[in-house]
């Protein structure tokens, strides 16, 4: 009874235990085999980017399992829905309708991705349409289960869907340790050392920019003491965080799923395969597009996380204002310029730090997996701060009690 009382009263302990339990379920599901499919017989294993993408989105293609799709379908759905609702307000749409739309789009995306992966499986006693459809259905179901686990964690635990992605990426990087040692022994000592040093520098800069902020002076009408001169609006230098990396991989990988399906339908058409170079990190075109997308998404996520429109409206309603800028459109325009400035800055530095190793490894299949390490660990660093910030908010909130709370409790 005492343990149950502690579990009920200690919100931090309760959230940690719930998150830990959900992570265990998530990790176990990654290794639950699909009936009729040969484990570790994914015919697309030579596609290092597909395996990397599955790791980034919490999936696992290095060993075929129920959760091989990860949260990829949900991420693609979020991108598509956001693209089609740019400039539109969804406040008039009920939560139920929004959820229905999201589930329908996610189902279509999951079926496309599931079919593309299931086609690349090797099956016991040969291929059949029944086995293909069964494997696809299981993969789609697994994607929805992961989405459900992430939503449970967001409501009752720490980190939401983010912590599942971080855990999946860490497990994937641990699996790459033997490859690093093997390359080190095969004469790639200098390249490995340079990659590791570059990754450490990138992580240090990521931490520095993540904790740096630009302070905009704000006149608070509700403050009538000496603190009025110290009031400011903090704008993070890297407001996009590490999310841009994950969504870049999503945008690059989804067209590859389409190409896989088209290639299976039209196996004699060589033009279909040629389009793959534009979305693969093993080609110069793919790396350049990767860096461009990184810049664009960094700016986009900066606007999403800061939202100048909402901030300017909230300031106008409260009576607060930025010196030398009129409330409303003028304030919104000023904040938008700040977002463009820092979004472009963070986009350039992340594209440069994540793209240079990929350019260096072009033409060398042995170094391709190691070269992606920089972007992965920058992503882990950015997402870890998101989780730590959530933990900090709960810890601070726990220090304050309700005015009406009985002192004996």
Curated annotation (Swiss-Prot):
Cellular localization per UniProt: Cell membrane
One GO process term, biological-process aspect: intracellular protein transmembrane transport
Pfam families xref list: SecY
Keyword Cell membrane: yes
Keywords: Cell membrane, Membrane, Protein transport, Translocation, Transmembrane, Transmembrane helix, Transport
GO cellular component, one term: plasma membrane
Keyword Transport assigned: yes
Membrane topology qualifier: Multi-pass membrane protein
TM stretches of this protein: 16-36, 61-81, 104-124, 132-152, 161-181, 190-210, 242-262, 286-306, 341-361, 374-394
Domain of life from the UniProt record: Bacteria
Described function: Part of the accessory SecA2/SecY2 system specifically required for export of possible cell wall proteins. The central subunit of a protein translocation channel.
Classification via PANTHER family: SECY/SEC61-ALPHA FAMILY MEMBER (PTHR10906)
HAMAP family in the cross-refs: SecY2
Subunit (UniProt): Component of the accessory SecA2/SecY2 protein translocase complex required to export cell wall proteins. May form heterotrimers with SecE and SecG subunits.
UniProt similarity note: Belongs to the SecY/SEC61-alpha family. SecY2 subfamily.
Protein name in the entry: Accessory Sec system protein translocase subunit SecY2
Protein species of origin: Streptococcus agalactiae serotype Ia (strain ATCC 27591 / A909 / CDC SS700)
Record gene name: secY2
């Amino acid at each position: 009874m005492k343990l149950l009382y502690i579990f009920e009263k200690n919100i931090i302990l309760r959230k940690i235990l719930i998150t830990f339990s959900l992570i265990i379920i998530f990790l176990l599901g990654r290794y639950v085999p699909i009936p009729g499919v040969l484990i570790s017989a994914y015919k697309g294993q030579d596609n290092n980017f597909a395996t990397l993408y599955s790791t980034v989105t919490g999936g696992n293609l290095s060993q075929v399992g129920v959760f091989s799709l990860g949260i990829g379908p949900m991420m693609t759905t979020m991108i598509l829905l956001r693209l089609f609702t740019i400039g539109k307000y969804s406040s008039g749409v009920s939560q139920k309708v929004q959820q229905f739309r999201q589930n329908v789009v996610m189902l279509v995306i999951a079926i496309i991705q599931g079919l593309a992966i299931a086609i690349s499986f090797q099956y016991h006693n040969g291929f059949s349409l029944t086995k293909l459809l069964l494997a696809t259905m299981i993969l789609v179901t697994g994607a929805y289960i992961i989405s459900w686990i992430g939503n449970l964690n967001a409501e009752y635990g720490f980190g939401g869907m983010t912590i599942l992605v971080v855990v999946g990426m860490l497990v994937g990087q641990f699996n790459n340790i033997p490859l690093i040692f093997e390359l080190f022994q095969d004469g790639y000592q200098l390249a490995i050392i340079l990659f590791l040093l570059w990754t450490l520098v990138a992580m240090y800069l990521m931490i520095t920019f993540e904790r740096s902020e630009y302070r905009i002076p704000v006149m608070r009408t509700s403050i009538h003491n000496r603190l009025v001169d110290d009031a400011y609006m903090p704008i993070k230098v890297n407001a996009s965080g590490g999310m841009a990396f994950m969504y870049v991989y999503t945008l690059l990988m989804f067209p590859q799923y389409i190409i896989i399906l088209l290639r299976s339908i039209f196996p004699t058409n060589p033009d279909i395969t040629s389009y793959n170079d534009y979305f693969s990190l093993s080609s110069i075109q793919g790396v350049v597009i990767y860096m461009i997308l990184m810049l664009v998404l960094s700016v986009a996520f900066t606007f999403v996380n800061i939202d100048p429109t909402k901030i300017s409206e909230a300031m106008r309603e409260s009576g607060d204002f930025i010196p030398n800028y009129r409330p409303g459109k003028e304030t919104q325009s000023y904040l938008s310029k700040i977002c463009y400035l820092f979004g472009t800055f963070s986009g350039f530095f992340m594209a440069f730090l994540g793209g240079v190793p990929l350019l260096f490894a072009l033409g060398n299949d042995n170094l391709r997996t190691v070269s992606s390490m920089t972007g992965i660990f920058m992503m882990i660093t950015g997402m870890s701060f998101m989780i730590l910030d959530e933990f900090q908010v709960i810890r601070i909130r726990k220090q304050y009690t309700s005015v009406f709370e009985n002192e004996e409790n």
